[in-house]
Amino acid sequence: MSYGQIRLVETSGASGATSQQDNLGYSGVKASHKMAEIDSGRMSKYKSKINKVGQSYGIEPALIAAIISRESRAGNQLKDGWGDWNPQRQAYNAWGLMQVDVNPNGGGHTAVGGWDSEDHLRQATGILVTFIERIRTKFPGWSKEKQLKGGIAAYNMGDKNVHSYEGVDENTTGRDYSNDVTARAQWYRDNGYSG
């Protein structure tokens, strides 16, 4: 099953707030590409797992790499595999390279496998596919590429928070999640993660 081609998805790239992670003096697609490039050295150790999982789910490996880049900076932002500390819960909200949401008030998933394992990548990619399929059902008139972008946004904040294509990122982290991930995926696709 084809979920659309990441190279054909329209994107405005990272917001200024997101690009500030790396003290970049610019935003947009250029910033997303730069952040993907910065993470590429760390990403290389996961490449074979990414390719294998992508092939098994029909998801472009570049998209998996891009989510890893955005969510955990290829593992660089994790503490023993955990990320997104929640001071109210006194616990982390997310697990692994792709930051599976384990918060009972959020995604409520149970972490599967080691933080950088193939099992983790399979779980997270399965969650992504579920969200793409939900967006397909919710917006059957959208092109595959628009549904793919909507699914990326839903991976971040749930399909109930995607209301329109024009406002696809209005509820995402940084208000740029699907645009930034798409631009990073396009960079990874052009730099060895084409499957």
From Swiss-Prot:
Source organism, top-level taxon: Eukaryota
InterPro entries membership: Glyco_hydro_23 (IPR002152), Lysozyme-like_dom_sf (IPR023346), Transglycosylase_SLT_dom_1 (IPR008258)
A GO term from the CC aspect: extracellular region
Enzyme active site: E71, D84
Tissue: Ubiquitous.
Pfam families: SLT (PF01464)
EC number: 3.2.1.17
Any one of the GO BP annotations: killing of cells of another organism
GO molecular function: lysozyme activity
Family matches, as Gene3D superfamilies: 1.10.530.10
pH-activity dependence text: Optimum pH is 6.0.
Keywords from the named record: Antimicrobial, Bacteriolytic enzyme, Glycosidase, Hydrolase
Temperature curve summary: Optimum temperature is 25 degrees Celsius.
Enzyme class: hydrolase
Catalyzed chemical reaction(s): Hydrolysis of (1->4)-beta-linkages between N-acetylmuramic acid and N-acetyl-D-glucosamine residues in a peptidoglycan and between N-acetyl-D-glucosamine residues in chitodextrins
Primary role: Possesses lytic activity against M.lysodeikticus and several fish pathogenic bacteria.
Family of this protein: Belongs to the glycosyl hydrolase 23 family.
The protein's name: Lysozyme g
